[in-house]
C-alpha cells in the first residue's frame, strides 16, 4: 500500500530503532519503524522525515499492527526552504508538535490532510513577513477545521471575548477566562486572517507572543492541553 504522510515527530525506541509519528492521507495518524544508527541509509531516512516533511512510502498496514514498516521512501513534494531556513525549521518543529498533540486518534480525514499539506507548502515558500505570522494563522485555521472556531457573529464593538464559551459578550463572565476589550477586538480580527493576507497583520514580538498564548489557552480549554510544548520557548525568542 502506498502512503502519503506528513512527518510529525521521531522518538528513539531502542539503539537500533526510531519510531516516527506521522499523519497520513490514507490512514490518519500512523507510526513507522525507522533504523537508528549512523549509517548512510539511517541518515537518509532521518533527513527525509524531518518535521513537516511531505513523504510517500510503501507499507503493509494490517489489523492490530500499531507500528508499520516503510520502504521505497521518497519526498512526495520537495521542500526548498523548510529545513534550511532556521526560522522555518523552528516553526515546523512547533507546528509538528502541536499536530502530534491534536491529531491523536481517528481514521483518515482527507480534508484535514489537504489543509496540512497546503499549509506546509505555503510555509516553505513564505517570505519573512509571511513567516512571522504563519504559526498564528495556521493555529486559527486549524481550530476552524477542528470545529472550535469562536462564534465571530457575536462580536460587537466594545464586547469581551469569553474564552470558555467562544463568544463575545458585553459584560464580563463570572470566571476569569476572558479577554479585555482591546484583546477581544484583536481576537475578532484574527478571524479575518488567511494565508493570503497574513503578511498584512503587523505585530511586534510581545504582541505576537501574547496572541500565541491566547490561542494555545483556547485550544487547551476546548480541545487538548497545549501546556507542555517543548518548542514553544524557542519559538517565542525567534519571532
Stretches with model-predicted labels:
Residues 1-239:
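Non-catalytic alpha-helical scaffolds and adjoining flexible linkers that form interface surfaces
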Amino acid at each position: 500500500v502506498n502512503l502519503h504522510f506528513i512527518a510529525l515527530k521521531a522518538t528513539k525506541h531502542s539503539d537500533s530503532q526510531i519510531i516516527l509519528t506521522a499523519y497520513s492521507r490514507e490512514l490518519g495518524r500512523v507510526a513507522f519503524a525507522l533504523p537508528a544508527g549512523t549509517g548512510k541509509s539511517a541518515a537518509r531516512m532521518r533527513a527525509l522525515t524531518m518535521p513537516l516533511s511531505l513523504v510517500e512510502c510503501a507499507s503493509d498496514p494490517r489489523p492490530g499492527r500499531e507500528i508499520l514498516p516503510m520502504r521505497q521512501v521518497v519526498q512526495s513534494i520537495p521542500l526548498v526552504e523548510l529545513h534550511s531556513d532556521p526560522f522555518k525549521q523552528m516553526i515546523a518543529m512547533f507546528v509538528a508538535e502541536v499536530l502530534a498533540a491534536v491529531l491523536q486518534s481517528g481514521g483518515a480525514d482527507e480534508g484535514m490532510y489537504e489543509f496540512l499539506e497546503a499549509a506546509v507548502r505555503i510555509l516553505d515558500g513564505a517570505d519573512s513577513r509571511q513567516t512571522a505570522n504563519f504559526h498564528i494563522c495556521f493555529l486559527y485555521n486549524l481550530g476552524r477545521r477542528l470545529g472550535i472556531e469562536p462564534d465571530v457573529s457575536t462580536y460587537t464593538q466594545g464586547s469581551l471575548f469569553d474564552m470558555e464559551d467562544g463568544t463575545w459578550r458585553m459584560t464580563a463572565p463570572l470566571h476569569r477566562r476572558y479577554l479585555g476589550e482591546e484583546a477581544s477586538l484583536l481576537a475578532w480580527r484574527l478571524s479575518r486572517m488567511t494565508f493570503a493576507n497574513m503578511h498584512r497583520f503587523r505585530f511586534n514580538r510581545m504582541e505576537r507572543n501574547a496572541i500565541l498564548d491566547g490561542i494555545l489557552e483556547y485550544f487547551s480549554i476546548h480541545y487538548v492541553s497545549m501546556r507542555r510544548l517543548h518548542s514553544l520557548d524557542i519559538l517565542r525568542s525567534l519571532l
